[in-house]
């Protein structure tokens, strides 16, 4: 009886092992080129937030692609509309508390997801919102340009 129980246990362990998903190699560390590009995107995004809070529309205009789009809660803007909203104080970015960032590359396009808490003045009212912000950067003429910026408000703080 003991021998048959032991054999059954060994058989079950063998079946379980053969049904388990095959182990894959660990994800290789990013190459220095992609790590460098990732850091460049992170730095550029952080600089963009500073320019937005300083209302530095000249620097933002150089960063924003001509065909860029900006998606806010309740509004979608073109490059010129976004710059005007910032210039006029329609939205004043007071502070950005970055909680988490991740960069992904699809071909030569960089997608940055940033979880943050934003304090802004919108229409004269100060608001604080938790967001995930999606930024899409594309290489143009040897530099990165911002093609899209989208705010998604989180339900949890």
Residue ranges and their predicted role:
Residues 19-62, 67-157:
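A beta-strand edge to alpha-helix "cap/lid" segment located at domain peripheries
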